[in-house]
Amino acid sequence: MCDTLVALPPATVDGSVIFAKNSDRPAEEAQSVRRYAGATHRAGDMVRCTYVEIPQAPATAAVVLSQPDWMWGAEMGANAHGVVIGNEAVWTRAPMGPPALLGMDMVRLGLERAAAAAEAVHIIAALLEVHGQGGACAEGDASFVYHNSFLIADAVEAWVLETADRDWAAERITAGTRNISNGLTIRTTYDKASKALIDRHADFAADFSAAPVQLDPTSRQAWGGRLLDQHHGAITPETMMAILADHESGICMHGAFATTASMVSRLAADGGHQHWMTGAPFPCRTPFKPMDVVLP
């Protein structure tokens, strides 16, 4: 499942951008916090993702990731440029393809290759169009497959990128709050999109969503939006941590699917970015620990 939220000025107390995500996964799945150093690569190098191998970038940034132990990709993370990304499962009318890139692979690839949020949108969309998405999203369960949406942010702006097979739409957020929770939300007001959508002026959510596009007021997405609205103008990292730990909304999930890891980031225009991760289940009782992308 998952819930991902972002707050930008004037919603935040200090003018920063604050990002948060709960990763809801099979309860028995371990998720670890891992750092990967920046690197340069030779022409022709390939990188092995969870299921497929693709051309490596000339250079990759240092990243800190919250990573299910069995996969190459990550549920969420941050890079040395102050870009953060989290993904969400979405179920669409588009067909599922064969094993290809997982959404979690695209989270890691976007962080390793992008120096800004808008660049990460471009990178992930291009990878999606070329390589596609597909494959089992839980270890040992070939039936658990889905498409992906992403919330991507830096200290200036945020983007929601939603996908259905190789089609995609992206919405830019420059003020206020936004949250996503396992459903398509972008209708006709996208800022960028795949060529097929632009050519037919598509309503992305209406065309592709496997569920009704009308927001259920009892859903986690609706709850998350209300909780953000309640704190508008005063949102801090601690506010986001409290939202991630909320039980009434279902955002802090317990059960066969559970919140197995959580992350909050504060992105500042002066470059003083801060990241906190639990590296363990249940933000209602697990402390958030400061995490540097690069060790001092």
Model segments located where?
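Catalytic-pocket segment enriched in acidic/His residues
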Residues: 244
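A contiguous strand-loop segment
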Residues: 1-103, 123-240, 250, 260
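Substrate-recognition/cap regions that form aromatic- and gly/pro-loop-enriched pockets
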Residues: 251-296
